């Protein structure tokens, strides 16, 4: 039997309060239903999952690829040892991984570029659902659609080739998914808002394996939650549609001052800004 939070998300359009309760449950690991009889996945089970993935990329303990695959941006979390790292190339892969995790009651972590400073991109004994292979990019009218695995420098390079801009962060190797779902502060934020303010639609895979496109007209509460209402805890994002602006001349500058002048600088900055 699925828990109430998972059932609520699967019935269509949840209320905003239901969504928030679901987010708390997700953070506590309550979106995994009761385990099937038996122990954890066998070698045959892992092999079956590997065959299911469109990428056929699955890194397991003992394999040559595992050490590199489990590493995150921050070496503070090198002690984490996931049971497996699955590289997903399309939403159906994410659905398959979630089904696998439900079957064997494995903790799940989503990973784009692995920059989480809290270590939320990994977990010992769990399944890492890595979306870094999802890097598609297409330009529409006033918007772009981009895969959740795209890093910022790649995203900005693709935008610049079309003379476009989207407000975002300044670290080139940060993943777009974590940035957008967490807010996204950058040099264009004063003019155009946070990255999350510019999300027009997000494709996510929910805990029951459903692939949903969330926008103001469809699954609007989940759309609201993905734009700052829950830190990405309501599903695994696979694609974003983001509002674009025509690229204009941008002036960047850096200020430095002696510590003794910090109070005056802050006061002057507040008056100017």
Question: Can you name each region flagged by the protein language model?
Answer:
Residues 61-64, 70-134, 148:
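Glycine-rich N-terminal segment of FAD-binding domains in flavoprotein oxidoreductases
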Residues 55, 103-107, 164, 233:
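Loop/turn elements at helix/coil->beta-strand transitions in domains of secreted/extracellular proteins
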Residues 162, 167-269:
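FAD-binding subdomain of flavoenzyme oxidoreductases
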Residues 1-14:
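N-terminal secretory signal peptides
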Residues 14-31:
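N-terminal export leaders
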């Amino acid at each position: 039997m699925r828990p109430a939070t998972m059932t609520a998300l699967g019935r269509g359009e949840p209320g905003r309060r239901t969504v928030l309760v679901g987010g708390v449950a997700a953070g506590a690991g309550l979106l995994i239903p009761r385990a099937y009889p038996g122990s954890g996945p066998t070698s045959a089970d892992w092999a079956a999952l590997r065959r299911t993935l469109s990428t056929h990329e699955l890194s397991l303990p003992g394999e040559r690829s595992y050490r590199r695959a489990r590493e995150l941006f921050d070496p503070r979390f090198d002690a984490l040892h996931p049971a497996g790292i699955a590289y997903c190339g399309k939403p159906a892969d994410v659905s398959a991984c979630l089904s696998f995790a439900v079957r064997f009651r494995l903790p799940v972590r989503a990973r784009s570029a692995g920059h989480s400073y809290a270590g939320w991109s990994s977990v010992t004994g769990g399944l890492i659902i890595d979306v870094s292979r999802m890097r598609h990019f297409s330009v529409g009218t006033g918007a772009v659609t981009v895969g959740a695995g795209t890093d910022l420098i790649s995203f900005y390079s693709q935008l610049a080739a079309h003379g476009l801009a989207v407000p975002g962060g300044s670290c080139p190797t940060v993943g777009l998914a974590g940035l957008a779902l967490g807010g996204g502060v950058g040099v264009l934020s004063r003019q155009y808002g946070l990255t999350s303010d510019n999300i027009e639609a997000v494709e996510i895979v929910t805990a029951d394996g459903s692939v949903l496109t969330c926008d103001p007209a469809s699954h609007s509460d989940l759309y609201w939650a993905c734009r700052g209402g829950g830190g990405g805890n309501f599903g695994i994002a696979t694609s974003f549609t983001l509002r674009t602006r025509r690229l204009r001349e941008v002036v960047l500058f850096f200020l430095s001052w002696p510590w003794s002048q910090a109070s005056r600088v802050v006061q002057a900055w507040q008056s100017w800004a």
